[in-house]
Amino acid sequence: MAVPFVEDWDLVQTLGEGAYGEVQLAVNRVTEEAVAVKIVDMKRAVDCPENIKKEICINKMLNHENVVKFYGHRREGNIQYLFLEYCSGGELFDRIEPDIGMPEPDAQRFFHQLMAGVVYLHGIGITHRDIKPENLLLDERDNLKISDFGLATVFRYNNRERLLNKMCGTLPYVAPELLKRREFHAEPVDVWSCGIVLTAMLAGELPWDQPSDSCQEYSDWKEKKTYLNPWKKIDSAPLALLHKILVENPSARITIPDIKKDRWYNKPLKKGAKRPRVTSGGVSESPSGFSKHIQSNLDFSPVNSASSEENVKYSSSQPEPRTGLSLWDTSPSYIDKLVQGISFSQPTCPDHMLLNSQLLGTPGSSQNPWQRLVKRMTRFFTKLDADKSYQCLKETCEKLGYQWKKSCMNQVTISTTDRRNNKLIFKVNLLEMDDKILVDFRLSKGDGLEFKRHFLKIKGKLIDIVSSQKIWLPAT
Protein backbone atom coordinates (compact mmCIF):
# COMPACT_ATOMS: atom_id res chain seq x y z
CA MET A 1 0.00 0.00 0.00
CA ALA A 2 1.01 3.63 -0.22
CA VAL A 3 3.22 4.85 2.61
CA PRO A 4 1.82 7.93 4.40
CA PHE A 5 4.27 10.81 4.24
CA VAL A 6 2.55 13.68 6.01
CA GLU A 7 -1.09 14.71 6.17
CA ASP A 8 -2.81 14.06 2.81
CA TRP A 9 0.47 13.06 1.12
CA ASP A 10 1.65 9.53 0.27
CA LEU A 11 5.01 8.31 -1.00
CA VAL A 12 4.10 6.06 -3.92
CA GLN A 13 7.31 5.32 -5.83
CA THR A 14 11.08 5.45 -5.47
CA LEU A 15 12.36 7.41 -8.44
CA GLY A 16 16.09 7.30 -7.83
CA GLU A 17 18.76 6.82 -5.21
CA GLY A 18 22.39 7.53 -4.57
CA ALA A 19 25.14 7.88 -2.03
CA TYR A 20 23.29 10.22 0.33
CA GLY A 21 19.62 9.42 -0.10
CA GLU A 22 16.84 8.90 -2.58
CA VAL A 23 14.13 10.60 -4.59
CA GLN A 24 10.53 9.68 -3.87
CA LEU A 25 7.32 10.49 -5.72
CA ALA A 26 4.83 12.09 -3.32
CA VAL A 27 1.16 12.32 -4.32
CA ASN A 28 -1.53 14.32 -2.55
CA ARG A 29 -4.44 11.92 -2.09
CA VAL A 30 -6.95 14.79 -2.08
CA THR A 31 -5.78 17.00 -4.96
CA GLU A 32 -3.78 14.31 -6.86
CA GLU A 33 -0.85 16.72 -7.15
CA ALA A 34 2.53 15.05 -7.60
CA VAL A 35 5.94 16.29 -6.51
CA ALA A 36 9.38 14.70 -6.40
CA VAL A 37 11.00 14.77 -2.97
CA LYS A 38 14.77 14.40 -2.80
CA ILE A 39 15.54 13.07 0.67
CA VAL A 40 19.16 13.57 1.73
CA ASP A 41 20.49 12.02 4.93
CA MET A 42 23.00 14.59 6.15
CA LYS A 43 24.61 11.98 8.42
CA ARG A 44 25.64 10.11 5.27
CA ALA A 45 26.82 13.38 3.70
CA VAL A 46 29.08 14.48 6.55
CA ASP A 47 32.04 14.75 4.18
CA CYS A 48 30.28 17.23 1.91
CA PRO A 49 27.55 19.27 3.63
CA GLU A 50 28.66 22.27 1.58
CA ASN A 51 27.84 20.35 -1.61
CA ILE A 52 24.24 19.95 -0.50
CA LYS A 53 24.07 23.61 0.45
CA LYS A 54 25.52 24.58 -2.93
CA GLU A 55 23.08 22.31 -4.78
CA ILE A 56 20.17 24.06 -3.04
CA CYS A 57 21.63 27.47 -3.77
CA ILE A 58 22.08 26.67 -7.47
CA ASN A 59 18.60 25.17 -7.72
CA LYS A 60 17.17 28.43 -6.37
CA MET A 61 18.72 30.28 -9.30
CA LEU A 62 17.07 28.13 -11.96
CA ASN A 63 13.91 28.86 -13.92
CA HIS A 64 13.72 27.45 -17.45
CA GLU A 65 11.38 25.15 -19.33
CA ASN A 66 14.18 22.67 -20.08
CA VAL A 67 15.41 22.51 -16.49
CA VAL A 68 13.66 20.61 -13.70
CA LYS A 69 11.97 23.18 -11.48
CA PHE A 70 12.88 23.56 -7.81
CA TYR A 71 10.05 24.45 -5.44
CA GLY A 72 11.93 24.75 -2.18
CA HIS A 73 13.57 22.84 0.65
CA ARG A 74 13.38 22.30 4.37
CA ARG A 75 15.36 20.42 6.98
CA GLU A 76 14.02 18.09 9.65
CA GLY A 77 16.75 16.90 12.01
CA ASN A 78 19.43 15.20 9.93
CA ILE A 79 17.20 14.93 6.86
CA GLN A 80 17.20 17.58 4.14
CA TYR A 81 14.19 17.61 1.79
CA LEU A 82 14.31 19.16 -1.69
CA PHE A 83 10.99 19.55 -3.51
CA LEU A 84 11.15 19.33 -7.30
CA GLU A 85 8.91 18.93 -10.29
CA TYR A 86 7.99 15.38 -11.22
CA CYS A 87 8.80 14.15 -14.75
CA SER A 88 6.38 11.34 -15.48
CA GLY A 89 8.06 10.56 -18.82
CA GLY A 90 11.07 9.02 -17.11
CA GLU A 91 14.73 9.23 -18.06
CA LEU A 92 16.08 9.79 -21.56
CA PHE A 93 18.10 6.57 -21.53
CA ASP A 94 14.84 4.60 -21.41
CA ARG A 95 14.00 5.92 -24.91
CA ILE A 96 17.32 4.73 -26.35
CA GLU A 97 17.25 1.20 -27.75
CA PRO A 98 20.59 -0.49 -27.03
CA ASP A 99 22.83 -0.68 -30.12
CA ILE A 100 20.12 1.00 -32.24
CA GLY A 101 19.31 4.37 -30.67
CA MET A 102 16.12 6.23 -31.54
CA PRO A 103 14.58 7.78 -34.68
CA GLU A 104 16.72 10.67 -35.89
CA PRO A 105 13.89 13.25 -35.67
CA ASP A 106 13.38 12.35 -31.99
CA ALA A 107 17.10 12.67 -31.31
CA GLN A 108 17.15 16.05 -33.04
CA ARG A 109 14.20 17.34 -31.01
CA PHE A 110 15.71 16.20 -27.71
CA PHE A 111 19.06 17.71 -28.74
CA HIS A 112 17.38 21.05 -29.50
CA GLN A 113 15.85 21.06 -26.02
CA LEU A 114 19.13 20.01 -24.41
CA MET A 115 20.86 22.91 -26.15
CA ALA A 116 18.16 25.33 -24.95
CA GLY A 117 18.66 24.19 -21.35
CA VAL A 118 22.45 24.35 -21.52
CA VAL A 119 22.39 27.81 -23.16
CA TYR A 120 20.22 28.99 -20.27
CA LEU A 121 22.54 27.51 -17.62
CA HIS A 122 25.67 28.95 -19.19
CA GLY A 123 23.91 32.28 -19.59
CA ILE A 124 23.50 32.56 -15.82
CA GLY A 125 27.04 31.32 -15.19
CA ILE A 126 26.28 27.71 -14.21
CA THR A 127 27.89 24.57 -15.57
CA HIS A 128 26.20 21.21 -14.96
CA ARG A 129 29.29 18.95 -15.22
CA ASP A 130 27.39 15.66 -15.36
CA ILE A 131 25.23 15.77 -18.49
CA LYS A 132 24.19 12.22 -19.42
CA PRO A 133 20.92 10.46 -20.32
CA GLU A 134 20.35 9.42 -16.70
CA ASN A 135 20.20 13.11 -15.75
CA LEU A 136 17.93 14.13 -18.62
CA LEU A 137 14.26 13.62 -17.79
CA LEU A 138 11.08 13.78 -19.85
CA ASP A 139 7.78 15.30 -18.83
CA GLU A 140 4.34 14.01 -19.77
CA ARG A 141 4.69 15.70 -23.18
CA ASP A 142 8.13 14.23 -23.83
CA ASN A 143 9.88 17.54 -23.24
CA LEU A 144 13.45 17.19 -22.02
CA LYS A 145 14.45 18.59 -18.62
CA ILE A 146 17.99 18.80 -17.26
CA SER A 147 18.12 17.43 -13.71
CA ASP A 148 20.49 16.73 -10.82
CA PHE A 149 22.65 19.72 -9.98
CA GLY A 150 24.69 17.88 -7.36
CA LEU A 151 27.91 18.44 -9.32
CA ALA A 152 27.01 21.83 -10.80
CA THR A 153 28.99 24.94 -10.00
CA VAL A 154 29.14 28.65 -10.80
CA PHE A 155 31.88 29.46 -13.30
CA ARG A 156 30.93 33.06 -14.06
CA TYR A 157 29.86 35.74 -11.61
CA ASN A 158 29.57 39.47 -12.25
CA ASN A 159 30.92 38.86 -15.79
CA ARG A 160 34.11 37.34 -14.41
CA GLU A 161 34.82 33.76 -15.47
CA ARG A 162 36.99 31.40 -13.47
CA LEU A 163 38.72 28.29 -14.73
CA LEU A 164 37.75 24.97 -13.18
CA ASN A 165 40.09 22.25 -11.95
CA LYS A 166 37.87 19.65 -10.30
CA MET A 167 37.63 16.38 -12.20
CA CYS A 168 34.07 15.21 -11.83
CA GLY A 169 31.38 13.67 -13.96
CA THR A 170 30.91 10.23 -15.52
CA LEU A 171 33.93 8.91 -17.43
CA PRO A 172 32.39 8.06 -20.83
CA TYR A 173 30.81 11.55 -20.93
CA VAL A 174 33.69 13.70 -19.62
CA ALA A 175 35.74 15.90 -21.92
CA PRO A 176 39.40 14.95 -22.52
CA GLU A 177 40.73 18.15 -20.94
CA LEU A 178 39.44 16.99 -17.54
CA LEU A 179 41.86 14.08 -17.71
CA LYS A 180 44.81 16.08 -19.07
CA ARG A 181 44.81 19.62 -17.73
CA ARG A 182 45.04 21.25 -14.36
CA GLU A 183 42.58 23.97 -15.37
CA PHE A 184 39.95 24.25 -18.07
CA HIS A 185 37.01 26.33 -19.25
CA ALA A 186 33.54 25.22 -18.15
CA GLU A 187 31.40 25.66 -21.26
CA PRO A 188 33.31 23.37 -23.69
CA VAL A 189 33.10 20.56 -21.11
CA ASP A 190 29.29 20.60 -21.13
CA VAL A 191 29.26 20.87 -24.94
CA TRP A 192 31.38 17.72 -25.19
CA SER A 193 29.00 15.81 -22.89
CA CYS A 194 26.07 16.90 -25.08
CA GLY A 195 27.91 15.40 -28.05
CA ILE A 196 28.23 12.06 -26.28
CA VAL A 197 24.50 12.15 -25.45
CA LEU A 198 23.73 12.81 -29.13
CA THR A 199 25.93 9.86 -30.12
CA ALA A 200 24.06 7.60 -27.69
CA MET A 201 20.69 8.76 -29.03
CA LEU A 202 21.68 8.10 -32.65
CA ALA A 203 23.67 4.87 -32.23
CA GLY A 204 22.40 3.26 -29.02
CA GLU A 205 25.86 2.96 -27.54
CA LEU A 206 28.62 5.05 -26.03
CA PRO A 207 31.68 5.61 -28.20
CA TRP A 208 34.35 4.89 -25.58
CA ASP A 209 35.09 4.16 -21.93
CA GLN A 210 36.97 7.44 -21.57
CA PRO A 211 38.49 10.03 -23.92
CA SER A 212 42.16 9.17 -23.38
CA ASP A 213 44.93 7.83 -25.61
CA SER A 214 44.91 4.58 -23.63
CA CYS A 215 41.41 3.91 -25.00
CA GLN A 216 41.51 2.31 -28.47
CA GLU A 217 38.03 3.52 -29.47
CA TYR A 218 38.97 7.12 -28.69
CA SER A 219 42.22 6.82 -30.65
CA ASP A 220 40.23 5.42 -33.59
CA TRP A 221 37.91 8.45 -33.46
CA LYS A 222 40.85 10.86 -33.51
CA GLU A 223 42.15 8.99 -36.56
CA LYS A 224 38.73 9.51 -38.20
CA LYS A 225 37.92 5.79 -38.47
CA THR A 226 34.23 6.43 -38.88
CA TYR A 227 33.71 3.12 -40.66
CA LEU A 228 33.72 1.58 -37.16
CA ASN A 229 30.90 1.49 -34.60
CA PRO A 230 29.17 3.56 -33.40
CA TRP A 231 29.93 6.09 -36.15
CA LYS A 232 28.97 3.88 -39.10
CA LYS A 233 25.41 3.77 -37.73
CA ILE A 234 25.06 7.56 -37.82
CA ASP A 235 23.93 9.49 -40.90
CA SER A 236 26.50 11.80 -42.51
CA ALA A 237 24.79 15.07 -41.49
CA PRO A 238 24.67 14.50 -37.71
CA LEU A 239 28.07 12.81 -37.91
CA ALA A 240 29.49 16.02 -39.41
CA LEU A 241 28.18 17.90 -36.37
CA LEU A 242 29.72 15.34 -34.00
CA HIS A 243 33.06 15.86 -35.78
CA LYS A 244 32.84 19.51 -34.68
CA ILE A 245 31.68 18.79 -31.11
CA LEU A 246 34.00 15.92 -30.17
CA VAL A 247 37.20 17.86 -30.86
CA GLU A 248 39.97 17.19 -28.36
CA ASN A 249 41.22 20.77 -28.20
CA PRO A 250 38.53 22.70 -26.27
CA SER A 251 39.48 26.00 -27.90
CA ALA A 252 38.79 24.45 -31.33
CA ARG A 253 35.56 22.79 -30.21
CA ILE A 254 32.36 24.18 -31.68
CA THR A 255 30.38 26.56 -29.48
CA ILE A 256 26.64 26.37 -28.95
CA PRO A 257 25.91 29.47 -31.11
CA ASP A 258 27.69 27.70 -33.98
CA ILE A 259 25.94 24.39 -33.24
CA LYS A 260 22.69 26.28 -33.78
CA LYS A 261 23.88 27.23 -37.29
CA ASP A 262 24.74 23.63 -38.19
CA ARG A 263 23.06 22.08 -41.23
CA TRP A 264 21.72 19.00 -39.43
CA TYR A 265 20.62 21.03 -36.41
CA ASN A 266 18.41 23.11 -38.71
CA LYS A 267 17.27 20.26 -40.93
CA PRO A 268 13.44 20.01 -40.90
CA LEU A 269 12.11 16.97 -39.10
CA LYS A 270 11.13 14.12 -41.36
CA LYS A 271 7.54 13.95 -42.53
CA GLY A 272 5.38 11.99 -40.14
CA ALA A 273 7.72 12.49 -37.19
CA LYS A 274 6.09 13.34 -33.91
CA ARG A 275 6.41 17.09 -33.63
CA PRO A 276 4.41 18.66 -30.82
CA ARG A 277 3.35 22.26 -30.88
CA VAL A 278 6.21 24.24 -29.40
CA THR A 279 6.60 27.53 -27.65
CA SER A 280 9.41 29.94 -28.43
CA GLY A 281 11.58 28.14 -25.91
CA GLY A 282 11.37 24.88 -27.79
CA VAL A 283 9.02 23.16 -25.35
CA SER A 284 5.67 21.63 -26.16
CA GLU A 285 2.75 23.50 -24.73
CA SER A 286 1.02 21.55 -22.00
CA PRO A 287 -2.28 22.09 -20.24
CA SER A 288 -2.32 24.49 -17.35
CA GLY A 289 -2.14 23.06 -13.87
CA PHE A 290 0.46 21.37 -11.77
CA SER A 291 3.48 20.21 -13.77
CA LYS A 292 4.86 16.77 -13.00
CA HIS A 293 8.63 16.60 -13.09
CA ILE A 294 11.33 14.84 -11.08
CA GLN A 295 14.95 15.15 -10.14
CA SER A 296 16.18 11.62 -10.24
CA ASN A 297 19.81 10.72 -10.40
CA LEU A 298 21.53 11.11 -7.06
CA ASP A 299 24.81 9.51 -8.04
CA PHE A 300 27.55 12.02 -7.23
CA SER A 301 30.18 10.48 -9.44
CA PRO A 302 33.57 12.16 -9.13
CA VAL A 303 36.17 10.74 -11.47
CA ASN A 304 38.91 11.86 -9.16
CA SER A 305 39.21 14.36 -6.38
CA ALA A 306 41.63 16.99 -7.57
CA SER A 307 42.67 20.02 -5.56
CA SER A 308 39.64 22.01 -4.54
CA GLU A 309 38.43 24.57 -7.04
CA GLU A 310 35.61 25.81 -4.86
CA ASN A 311 37.00 29.19 -3.90
CA VAL A 312 33.55 30.71 -4.17
CA LYS A 313 31.53 30.18 -0.98
CA TYR A 314 27.85 29.36 -1.26
CA SER A 315 25.19 29.97 1.29
CA SER A 316 21.56 29.08 0.93
CA SER A 317 20.80 32.44 2.48
CA GLN A 318 22.87 34.43 -0.02
CA PRO A 319 20.77 36.51 -2.42
CA GLU A 320 20.28 35.05 -5.88
CA PRO A 321 19.69 36.86 -9.16
CA ARG A 322 16.06 37.62 -9.83
CA THR A 323 14.93 34.79 -12.08
CA GLY A 324 11.18 34.94 -11.83
CA LEU A 325 10.92 33.73 -8.26
CA SER A 326 7.16 34.04 -8.31
CA LEU A 327 7.11 31.13 -10.75
CA TRP A 328 8.42 28.83 -8.02
CA ASP A 329 5.11 29.14 -6.21
CA THR A 330 3.22 26.50 -8.13
CA SER A 331 0.31 26.40 -5.67
CA PRO A 332 -2.24 25.11 -4.58
CA SER A 333 -1.14 26.74 -1.41
CA TYR A 334 2.55 26.64 -2.44
CA ILE A 335 2.76 22.86 -2.66
CA ASP A 336 0.81 22.56 0.56
CA LYS A 337 3.25 24.84 2.40
CA LEU A 338 6.11 22.70 1.10
CA VAL A 339 4.41 19.53 2.17
CA GLN A 340 3.30 20.67 5.59
CA GLY A 341 6.44 20.93 7.63
CA ILE A 342 7.27 17.23 7.47
CA SER A 343 7.64 14.97 10.45
CA PHE A 344 7.52 11.26 9.75
CA SER A 345 9.36 7.98 9.99
CA GLN A 346 11.03 6.66 6.85
CA PRO A 347 9.59 3.35 5.64
CA THR A 348 12.07 0.49 5.80
CA CYS A 349 11.22 -0.54 2.26
CA PRO A 350 9.83 2.37 0.27
CA ASP A 351 9.36 0.42 -2.96
CA HIS A 352 6.89 -1.87 -1.16
CA MET A 353 4.42 0.98 -1.37
CA LEU A 354 3.40 -0.12 -4.87
CA LEU A 355 2.30 -3.64 -4.06
CA ASN A 356 -1.38 -3.00 -3.47
CA SER A 357 -3.70 -3.36 -6.45
CA GLN A 358 -6.13 -1.03 -4.72
CA LEU A 359 -3.46 1.67 -4.90
CA LEU A 360 -2.76 1.01 -8.54
CA GLY A 361 -6.40 1.11 -9.55
CA THR A 362 -7.54 0.68 -13.13
CA PRO A 363 -6.94 2.78 -16.23
CA GLY A 364 -9.43 5.60 -16.50
CA SER A 365 -10.41 5.78 -12.86
CA SER A 366 -10.62 9.34 -11.62
CA GLN A 367 -8.38 8.87 -8.58
CA ASN A 368 -5.70 6.65 -10.04
CA PRO A 369 -2.17 6.80 -8.58
CA TRP A 370 -1.01 4.52 -11.42
CA GLN A 371 -1.32 7.59 -13.63
CA ARG A 372 1.39 9.20 -11.51
CA LEU A 373 3.92 6.40 -11.83
CA VAL A 374 6.89 7.20 -14.01
CA LYS A 375 6.81 5.70 -17.50
CA ARG A 376 9.30 2.93 -18.11
CA MET A 377 9.87 0.54 -20.97
CA THR A 378 11.70 -1.81 -18.59
CA ARG A 379 8.63 -3.63 -17.29
CA PHE A 380 6.32 -6.41 -18.40
CA PHE A 381 3.35 -8.48 -17.26
CA THR A 382 3.68 -12.21 -16.65
CA LYS A 383 1.25 -15.07 -17.18
CA LEU A 384 1.97 -16.44 -13.68
CA ASP A 385 1.12 -15.53 -10.10
CA ALA A 386 3.55 -13.59 -7.90
CA ASP A 387 5.28 -16.61 -6.33
CA LYS A 388 5.87 -18.41 -9.63
CA SER A 389 6.97 -15.17 -11.34
CA TYR A 390 9.43 -14.55 -8.52
CA GLN A 391 10.81 -18.09 -8.76
CA CYS A 392 11.27 -17.90 -12.54
CA LEU A 393 13.01 -14.52 -12.24
CA LYS A 394 15.29 -15.82 -9.49
CA GLU A 395 16.27 -18.96 -11.41
CA THR A 396 16.93 -16.99 -14.60
CA CYS A 397 19.10 -14.38 -12.88
CA GLU A 398 21.10 -17.05 -11.05
CA LYS A 399 21.72 -18.90 -14.34
CA LEU A 400 22.93 -15.63 -15.89
CA GLY A 401 25.38 -15.15 -13.01
CA TYR A 402 23.77 -12.13 -11.36
CA GLN A 403 24.08 -11.44 -7.65
CA TRP A 404 20.60 -11.72 -6.18
CA LYS A 405 19.29 -10.28 -2.91
CA LYS A 406 15.71 -10.12 -1.69
CA SER A 407 15.39 -6.56 -0.37
CA CYS A 408 11.94 -6.92 1.14
CA MET A 409 8.57 -8.36 0.20
CA ASN A 410 8.20 -8.56 -3.58
CA GLN A 411 11.40 -6.61 -4.26
CA VAL A 412 14.83 -7.88 -5.22
CA THR A 413 18.14 -6.15 -5.84
CA ILE A 414 20.22 -7.51 -8.71
CA SER A 415 23.93 -6.69 -9.06
CA THR A 416 26.41 -7.36 -11.83
CA THR A 417 29.19 -5.64 -13.76
CA ASP A 418 28.72 -4.12 -17.19
CA ARG A 419 30.88 -4.36 -20.31
CA ARG A 420 33.20 -1.69 -18.90
CA ASN A 421 33.57 -3.65 -15.66
CA ASN A 422 31.60 -1.01 -13.77
CA LYS A 423 29.07 -1.84 -11.07
CA LEU A 424 25.48 -2.15 -12.27
CA ILE A 425 22.65 -2.44 -9.75
CA PHE A 426 18.94 -2.54 -10.45
CA LYS A 427 15.81 -3.17 -8.41
CA VAL A 428 12.96 -5.40 -9.51
CA ASN A 429 9.49 -5.06 -8.02
CA LEU A 430 6.70 -7.55 -8.57
CA LEU A 431 3.54 -5.49 -8.50
CA GLU A 432 0.00 -6.81 -8.30
CA MET A 433 -2.19 -4.91 -10.73
CA ASP A 434 -5.71 -5.89 -11.73
CA ASP A 435 -5.06 -9.52 -10.79
CA LYS A 436 -1.92 -9.60 -12.89
CA ILE A 437 1.75 -9.40 -11.95
CA LEU A 438 3.80 -6.52 -13.32
CA VAL A 439 7.57 -7.08 -13.17
CA ASP A 440 9.08 -3.60 -12.95
CA PHE A 441 12.85 -3.04 -13.35
CA ARG A 442 14.46 0.20 -12.14
CA LEU A 443 18.08 1.29 -12.50
CA SER A 444 19.65 1.93 -9.10
CA LYS A 445 23.31 2.50 -9.97
CA GLY A 446 25.27 2.44 -13.19
CA ASP A 447 24.89 3.19 -16.88
CA GLY A 448 21.37 3.37 -18.29
CA LEU A 449 22.17 1.80 -21.67
CA GLU A 450 23.91 -1.13 -20.00
CA PHE A 451 20.90 -1.53 -17.70
CA LYS A 452 18.59 -1.76 -20.71
CA ARG A 453 20.84 -4.39 -22.32
CA HIS A 454 20.61 -6.56 -19.21
CA PHE A 455 16.85 -6.03 -18.94
CA LEU A 456 16.38 -7.24 -22.53
CA LYS A 457 18.60 -10.26 -21.86
CA ILE A 458 16.55 -11.25 -18.79
CA LYS A 459 13.25 -10.63 -20.56
CA GLY A 460 14.42 -12.77 -23.47
CA LYS A 461 15.14 -15.68 -21.13
CA LEU A 462 11.68 -15.27 -19.57
CA ILE A 463 9.84 -15.02 -22.88
CA ASP A 464 7.72 -18.11 -22.12
CA ILE A 465 6.11 -16.42 -19.11
CA VAL A 466 5.92 -12.85 -20.48
CA SER A 467 2.35 -11.82 -21.21
CA SER A 468 1.54 -10.22 -24.54
CA GLN A 469 -0.60 -7.65 -22.71
CA LYS A 470 0.63 -4.14 -23.36
CA ILE A 471 1.64 -1.98 -20.44
CA TRP A 472 -0.99 0.69 -20.00
CA LEU A 473 0.54 4.12 -19.64
CA PRO A 474 -1.01 7.53 -19.09
CA ALA A 475 -2.04 9.23 -22.32
CA THR A 476 0.24 12.03 -23.46
Curated annotation (Swiss-Prot):
GO MF terms held by the record: ATP binding; histone H3T11 kinase activity; protein domain specific binding; protein kinase activity; protein serine kinase activity; protein serine/threonine kinase activity
Active site positions, chain numbering: D130 (proton acceptor)
Record annotation: effect of changing S345E: Enhances interaction with RAD51
Main location: nucleus
InterPro entries: Chk1_catalytic_dom (IPR034670), Kinase-like_dom_sf (IPR011009), Prot_kinase_dom (IPR000719), Protein_kinase_ATP_BS (IPR017441), Ser/Thr_kinase_AS (IPR008271)
Annotated residues for binding of ATP: L15, G16, E17, G18, A19, Y20, G21, E22, V23, K38
Protein kinase domain ranges (all copies): 9-265
Keyword DNA repair: yes
Ranges for region Interaction with CLSPN: 1-265
Subcellular location: Nucleus; Chromosome; Cytoplasm; Cytoplasm, Cytoskeleton, Microtubule organizing center, Centrosome
Regulation: Activated through phosphorylation predominantly by ATR but also by ATM in response to DNA damage or inhibition of DNA replication. Activation is modulated by several mediators including CLSPN, BRCA1 and FEM1B. Proteolytic cleavage at the C-terminus by SPRTN during normal DNA replication activates the protein kinase activity.
Family assignment from sequence similarity: Belongs to the protein kinase superfamily. CAMK Ser/Thr protein kinase family. NIM1 subfamily.
PANTHER family hit by this protein: MAP/MICROTUBULE AFFINITY-REGULATING KINASE, SERINE_THREONINE-PROTEIN KINASE CHK1
Name assigned to this protein: Serine/threonine-protein kinase Chk1
Source organism (scientific name): Homo sapiens (Human)
